[in-house]
């Protein structure tokens, strides 16, 4: 409650809660429902992953192919380690621990109720018959695909879970395979959209890695490319919650892609606080290098986040008049604004700007 009071968006959320607005009620309904269902999703994920790992007679080849396909040997595991890691992860309790670690992500937890709501809204709009199995498969598949970014980021960033990075390298190809097989249950157009989005996300990841190596080469164009890792993953998931059918596929894509980029800005601010350094690459780093003023850089990052959110809101004006879950989406965007405002206010309160400036000067040499 104190966190909500600390931002204007949070106060607006509290006001809607007191008035029991339609958006608040819809959002709360899905939040409570998915909190109850999340453990079931996690269990399905663990079981599918365990089955895939134990059944693979050539894990070395699987891991090499994944690293080659992604275009990053940093994601590969030394051949001599593969069998030991497979033996460790074949223990279902150990595997469950690793899955829980990568599912312990605000990004994953924020998207689970959203995808459920979008899928239901699209099903109602198109008059689809009820298929719980298909619904679970499409939603689970996209959550798992989004979750793949967690171990990949931890491997590349090397800023948390250092003792588990080999386990994550082993798990990655199986996570992707499970996501694909589940998403395919939505039909060929859904799988095709996913593959196109995943290709774009890989480009974003590749640019991210290049900029980590040469931070001083950052510019607005390669930052926009880097943000494909948010835009493509979230936008594609939004598109496929409508099973890639217009008009909702395009509308959901716009809203979720831009909301994902907006959250990316907030995530960069949160990471700066937690890691006591400006993230490389990030919008704060880009603005700091060009203004020479770290505090101003974070102000501009917040301005950038508002531009992304304004674009996301265009999707609301595109929705069909009879779309029942528009208030849910309006409330969702309010929570996104609160998230960014909260971490920006926390940064200003702590004011680590001089320390950040020294570290940027060292990194950008």
For the regions a language model picked out, list residue spans one by one.
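All-alpha prenyltransferase/terpene-synthase fold signal
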Residues: 1-365
């Amino acid at each position: 409650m104190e966190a909500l009071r600390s931002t204007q968006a949070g106060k607006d959320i509290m006001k809607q809660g007191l008035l029991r607005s339609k958006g608040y009620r819809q959002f709360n309904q899905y939040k409570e429902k998915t909190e109850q269902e999340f453990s079931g999703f996690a269990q399905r994920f663990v079981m599918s992953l365990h089955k895939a790992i134990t059944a693979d007679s050539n894990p070395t080849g699987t891991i090499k192919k994944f690293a080659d396909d992604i275009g990053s040997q940093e994601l590969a595991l030394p051949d001599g380690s593969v069998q030991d890691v497979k033996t460790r992860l074949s223990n279902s309790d150990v595997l469950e621990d690793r899955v829980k670690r990568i599912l312990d992500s605000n990004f994953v937890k924020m998207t689970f109720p959203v995808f459920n709501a979008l899928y239901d809204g699209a099903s109602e709009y198109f008059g689809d018959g009820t298929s719980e199995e298909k619904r679970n498969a499409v939603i689970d598949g996209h959550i798992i695909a989004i979750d793949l970014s967690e171990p990949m980021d931890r491997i590349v960033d090397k800023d948390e879970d250092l003792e588990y990075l080999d386990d994550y390298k082993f798990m990655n190809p199986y996570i992707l395979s499970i996501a694909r097989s589940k998403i395919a249950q939505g039909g060929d157009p859904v799988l095709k959209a996913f593959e196109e989005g995943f290709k774009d996300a890989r480009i974003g990841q590749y640019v991210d890695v290049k900029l980590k190596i040469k931070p001083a080469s950052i510019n607005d164009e390669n930052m926009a490319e880097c943000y494909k890792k948010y835009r493509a993953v979230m936008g594609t998931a939004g598109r496929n919650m409508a099973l890639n059918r217009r008009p909702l596929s395009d509308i959901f894509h716009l809203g979720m892609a831009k909301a994902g980029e907006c959250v990316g800005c907030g995530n960069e601010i949160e990471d700066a606080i937690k890691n006591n350094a400006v993230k490389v690459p990030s919008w704060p780093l880009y603005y700091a290098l060009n203004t020479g003023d770290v505090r101003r850089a974070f102000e501009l990052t917040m301005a950038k986040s508002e531009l992304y959110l304004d674009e996301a809101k265009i999707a609301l004006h595109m929705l069909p008049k009879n779309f029942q879950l528009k208030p849910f989406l309006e409330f969702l965007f309010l929570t996104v604004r609160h998230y960014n405002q909260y971490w920006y206010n926390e940064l200003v309160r702590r004011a680590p700007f001089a320390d950040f400036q020294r570290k940027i000067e060292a990194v950008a040499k």
